[in-house]
Regions:
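Positively charged n-region of N-terminal signal peptides that target proteins for export
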Residues: 1-6
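Predominantly soluble domains enriched in secretory-pathway, periplasmic, or organellar proteins
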Residues: 21-463
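Bacterial N-terminal signal peptides
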Residues: 7-18
Length: 463
């Protein structure tokens, strides 16, 4: 068994004492997506760190609806990702399946949407449980929206699904920030899975009939469509910026020429894709943009969940050079055959560590980047359990961590999680605050959505 640091009762006690006076400077809030609960939860970070508020919802200051209610009063939306604007005045929220009622839409392949929200109103308790913070909503340009990057003039939105199916996407949309218009769309080439793929032109040429694709994973006919999940921007030594996508359908990572995409060119992949252990989901660039970390979440072809993250070199990937995957690190489990289902990643600001949420094994890994690049089997330097309180129905359910973020000083990681319950169930999700120095959970916020996904940290408030 590898030697790693785990949270002990002693560490927990010390960590609670350590946060008696929170280290955060200025006001800070966590903005967490409620997912099946179509609201964004604003959590006062300092309040969450106060011991009396631990394992309660007391630090939640407001919950903002991501869509206007349906005419019959039913809440709508499916918030899975959230990214702030440069001035932190606006939050862009990805609704994976758009303005759906989660009690009615019970499949993949809903049309994605983007909610544009006023951050000040999101933090105002007077607007709790209203849509007052919602400024506008627009179509994301395809189905199963998930990844989001905010650029000066456009949003980049990746799509992992096709109409009413889990397979069949090769699209990343470019959405005008001011108008919501779709200004362009990246079209990714199909894969080569070893079985026949649809005769589908890339770029698309009309008229072409819709392709026949698998309805639901796992299915051995997956592998033709990349189905891009989260996306990230890397910096090449040539001075150019490259777009990376984790492709759940083809078990690999694409590298694309961002400048050409912004000029309206639809096909912009510049090199062969980089294979990873299995279908990726979360992907993030290092602070200097030279490395890309990506999770191996699950296979779409067979019943298999991954247990590694990959660290990819931007320059080697963009040039198609061998060894672009610099390191592959097992996380969440000591068993080489164990399935930890790593979900998302976040880098510390100094680029020395990577935080990984392991959904299946209910823990959070800390990966030492220097050790990983040296192929040290001890690169996973900490593994921190995340647990939940008993639910109102008397059942203690697993943590199922998903979203990750790190404070700008590198002191804390925040992680969202919780199982998917019936949409009518009381808010049951959890946000954990982890002290990265103590390697321990130091605060637990309960009652955060239903199956929460992405989250972000707002420090020092909007400009």
């Amino acid at each position: 068994m590898r030697t790693i640091v785990v949270a002990s009762w002693t560490a927990l006690l010390l960590s609670f004492l350590a946060v008696a006076e929170p280290a955060l400077a200025g006001d800070a809030f966590i903005l967490a997506t409620g997912r099946r609960d179509p609201r964004i939860y604003a959590i006062d970070f300092k309040a969450a760190l106060r011991t009396p508020n631990d394992r309660t919802p007391n630090a939640i200051v407001s919950r903002s609806k991501v869509q206007a209610d349906r005419l019959d009063g039913t809440p709508l939306g499916d918030p899975a990702n959230i990214v702030l604007s440069e001035d932190r005045r606006t939050a862009y929220v990805i609704n994976h399946h758009g303005a759906v009622n989660n009690a009615e839409f019970l499949q993949h392949g809903g049309r994605g949407s983007v909610s544009v929200m006023n951050v000040r109103k999101m933090l105002d308790p007077r607007f709790d449980n209203t849509d007052a913070a919602l400024e506008r909503s627009y179509d994301s340009g395809y189905f199963g929206a998930v990844g989001l990057l905010v650029l000066p003039e456009v949003l980049l939105v990746s799509h992992s699904e096709n109409w009413l199916t889990e397979d069949g996407s090769n699209r990343i949309s470019l959405i005008d920030r001011k108008t919501g218009s779709r200004r362009g769309q990246i079209e990714m080439v199909l894969g080569h899975p070893g079985h026949a793929c649809p005769d589908f032109p890339v770029p698309f040429v009309s008229p072409t009939p819709p392709p026949v694709v698998p309805f639901l994973a796992s299915d051995p006919q997956f592998g033709c469509w990349p189905n891009p999940e989260f996306i990230a921007l890397g910096n090449g030594s040539d001075g150019k910026t490259y777009l990376f996508s984790g492709n759940a359908g083809t078990d690999d990572v694409s590298v694309m020429d961002l400048k050409r995409a912004l000029a309206g060119v639809p096909v912009v992949e510049v090199a062969p894709r980089v294979p990873v252990q299995t279908g990726p989901f979360g992907i993030k660039a290092s602070p200097n943009g030279k490395l890309i970390a990506v999770t191996a979440r699950e296979s779409a072809k067979v019943d298999f969940e991954g247990n590694t993250i990959s660290i990819i070199d931007v320059d080697r990937a963009r040039t198609g050079s061998p060894g672009a995957e610099l390191a592959r690190v097992r996380v969440g489990t000591d068993d080489p055959a164990g399935e930890s289902r790593p979900f998302t990643v976040a880098w510390t600001p100094d680029g020395r560590e990577i935080v990984v949420a392991n959904y299946r094994t209910n823990n959070v890994s800390i990966v030492d980047v220097r050790r990983a690049l040296a192929h040290d089997p001890r690169a996973e330097v900490a593994r921190i359990p995340v647990t939940r309180l008993i639910d109102p129905d008397g059942i203690v359910r697993p943590g199922n961590p998903k979203g990750t973020a790190v404070t700008s000083d590198g002191r804390y990681a925040v992680v969202s999680g919780g199982p998917r319950l019936d949409p009518t169930a009381p808010p049951s999700g959890t946000v954990w605050v982890i002290d990265l120095h103590m390697r321990a959970v130091v605060a637990t916020v309960t009652g955060v959505g239903n199956d929460p996904y992405g989250l972000t940290i707002l420090e020092d408030g909007p400009d």
